[in-house]
């Protein structure tokens, strides 16, 4: 996937010391304020994935939804939601993951993932890769195969791609 950092960087708000001191937060919600930029993001992802064998798109709560939902409509593919623990009403598979300050848990409905389906996993940002790795494990435990991972932004200096080495990982914007 072609690096589009120079173009998209001007539309991504950078918030210092959020959510805690010393962290620079890349806020993609500013991209949503420019329909032509938001459309461009979805079209870039569509162009890259349209010809790949993908059966469904899975998205990580919550900003992954902003990319995955319009892309699934454009590609006419089912959308599978990965949510934080306790947010899904039917029977679920769950997967714990480590946070800086403890542990979290994500879940997916057991009947949302078809056996052996080829899945495109989407989140807004790749930092440590922990959430995406847990999401991929969760989807595979549910019977799917994660074929690709797409993130709008990748923080290359953190090297989250390292723990995702078993997957094809693509991003449009790369920050060092």
From Swiss-Prot:
Belongs to the purine/pyrimidine phosphoribosyltransferase family. One of its GO terms (cellular component) is cytoplasm. Pathway: Purine metabolism; AMP biosynthesis via salvage pathway; AMP from adenine: step 1/1. Its EC number is 2.4.2.7. It comes from the Bacteria. It catalyses: AMP + diphosphate = 5-phospho-alpha-D-ribose 1-diphosphate + adenine. Keywords: Cytoplasm, Glycosyltransferase, Purine salvage, Transferase. It is found in: Cytoplasm. Gene3D superfamilies: 3.40.50.2020. Its main location: cytoplasm. It comes from Borrelia garinii subsp. bavariensis (strain ATCC BAA-2496 / DSM 23469 / PBi) (Borreliella bavariensis). Homodimer. One of its GO terms (molecular function) is adenine phosphoribosyltransferase activity. Catalyzes a salvage reaction resulting in the formation of AMP, that is energically less costly than de novo synthesis. GO terms for biological process: adenine salvage; AMP salvage; purine ribonucleoside salvage. This is Adenine phosphoribosyltransferase.
